[in-house]
């Protein structure tokens, strides 16, 4: 495929040439017709169930919507019936990319809109269809100013490890021009300066089944697991910390073992998530192995065992650009697709709604938050583009001085 490319500097000037030079008034709400379209788009997205691995229907609907609104759409297959959606205007290679995810966590909760309180809820209403809809409306309202130098990417699989974004990152047909990438997640309408890293792992204890009346004839996997978790509880106090991100946390998300109260447990498992505030995954991995060393040795001496299985390589803290005037800033403890997209680019993280209600049975936000997100995304796009132009101009001036 032949891709249309333009020199980086000319892209910056061409984009800025169409941006109004006088300050733009910041209304508190969108105009009625745009707000109505936003509400419709958000409702359709939330109404369409898209729990991870089941994103086909929402992807098909969103593709039709974007094509109807004059976007060129490409679908990248991630796995059977699961597609990332890349949308752009007159050119495929753009400087600016807006991206979020269209999958949600289970279970599905239906859409609702309380017109008395103007609260809108349902699964994905915040995380992250609350970002997807405003991104699209914001891009449609500003792409003319930017001479179509903006594109959209909506990925699958963010909630279970980011297979969609990783697939896009390694896609041979991935556009190579993106220099400003804005990610959408619930951030309370603040710019995020970074988030914690992640290291997930599982423990598996193996014992020997026996009648509970004669426990000495067996080896309790549950006992092994309890001892292992006890050592990890002690380790929590010694995990890395930082001023910016606080303490590294370790959550015992799921623990199970045995088959009945009157049977010595033959197996036990635990799934654990560690949110890194400092250090590296290798450092914390070493701490975990060290903390469990004696438990593993003792279990083997009894005829049992304790194994650690790592969910992935993990990643350290993720620093994110937040140098745009006019936005409040924060750091967050949850993970995103930001580290899953490789490349040398400015990356921003913003979205309406709060992570505190995401993944819950009361996931919701106010309609005014959706409207304001459109205005904020537009402002973020323009400010980031202006900053890029200034940096390019400064670089050009420095090069001329050196000559």
Question: Model-predicted segments: where are they?
Answer:
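Metal-dependent amide/peptide-bond hydrolase catalytic core
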Residues: 18-36, 74-77, 202-403
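Acidic-glycine-rich active-site phosphate/pyrophosphate-binding loop
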Residues: 102-116, 178, 193-204
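Short beta-strand segments
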Residues: 99-100, 153-155, 181-185, 204-206, ...
